[in-house]
Amino acid sequence: MSVPHLRLGVNIDHVATVRNARGGEYPDPIRAAKIAEQAGADGITAHLREDRRHITDADIDGLMAALSVPLNFEMAATDEMQKIALRHKPHAVCIVPEKREERTTEGGLEVAREENRLAHFIAPLREVGCRVSIFIAADRRQVEAAHRIGAQVIELHTGAYCDAHAEGDFATRDRELEALREMSAFAHSLGLEVHAGHGLTYDTVQPVAAFPEVMELNIGHFLIGEAIFRGLHPAIAEMRRLMDEARA
């Protein structure tokens, strides 16, 4: 049986982080998105946080106008963000947890605690044609809850796996990888499309990319950092190559 093409979503948030460190127009996240397309990205991910610390409303406007690949719009489950998503109608909306004090998204959404609210929150997004994804830990209870609320997609948080690898804690790394494998298969059995991301690097991407149920990986911070040394196009192209190699 042939394994489906594994999509690469390139997150451009931290191009905006560099821009906002000084202000002004450069580097331009939209230019980065166009380069990502040329380098093999199948989609672009951008997280409009409530505090606008990196991506801005104007960036979302520009991305919607400029992209020839789908936009995956990451956002918190707030009324403000829902209104923005309903106005733009991006291809995909990924609901993520958000805390003002965090540097980056620290964990998965606790769907099981907020099933009723989240079910009502995502319904209008689905009605206008957005594919709704929920960013969760590799936990059976959260996968089941995401399915019950009507999400079409889950994105599994790979951060614990990547952190354990970076720290040299290979027992934990292998345990986290097995949890990702099991929950990918379980979610797929429920009819959910499976994505994964957070903290993936050249060293950690291939074991996750090899899971046949995973249809998309969203990768950002590492690629933007690697671009300093080898350029954005080559950095993304190498990630694309590693993903394809793992899937072969």
Swiss-Prot record:
Q: Give the domain of life.
A: Bacteria
Task: Give the coiled coil ranges.
Answer: none
For this UniProt entry, the molecular function terms from Gene Ontology, in alphabetical order, are: pyridoxine 5'-phosphate synthase activity
Q: Which reaction does it catalyse?
A: 3-amino-2-oxopropyl phosphate + 1-deoxy-D-xylulose 5-phosphate = pyridoxine 5'-phosphate + phosphate + 2 H2O + H(+)
> Which residues carry the site feature described as Transition state stabilizer?
E155
Per the record, its GO cellular-component terms are: cytosol
Binding residues for 1-deoxy-D-xylulose 5-phosphate, per the UniProt record?
Answer: D13, H14, R49, H54, T104
Q: Where in the cell is it found?
A: Cytoplasm
Keywords of the record, alphabetical order, are: Cytoplasm, Pyridoxine biosynthesis, Transferase
Supply the EC number(s).
2.6.99.2
Pathway connected to this protein: Cofactor biosynthesis; pyridoxine 5'-phosphate biosynthesis; pyridoxine 5'-phosphate from D-erythrose 4-phosphate: step 5/5
User: What CDD domains does UniProt report for this protein, alphabetically?
Assistant: PNPsynthase
**Would the keyword Transferase be found if you checked this record's keyword annotation?**
yes
| Amino acids binding 3-amino-2-oxopropyl phosphate | N11, R22, G199, G220, H221
Residues forming the catalytic site: H47 (proton acceptor), E74 (proton acceptor), H198 (proton donor)
Subunit and partners: Homooctamer; tetramer of dimers.
Q: Which family does the UniProt entry place this protein in? A: Belongs to the PNP synthase family.
NCBIfam families per record: pdxJ (TIGR00559), PRK05265.1-2 (NF003624), PRK05265.1-3 (NF003625), PRK05265.1-5 (NF003627)
What function does the entry list? Catalyzes the complicated ring closure reaction between the two acyclic compounds 1-deoxy-D-xylulose-5-phosphate (DXP) and 3-amino-2-oxopropyl phosphate (1-amino-acetone-3-phosphate or AAP) to form pyridoxine 5'-phosphate (PNP) and inorganic phosphate.
Name this protein carries in UniProt: Pyridoxine 5'-phosphate synthase
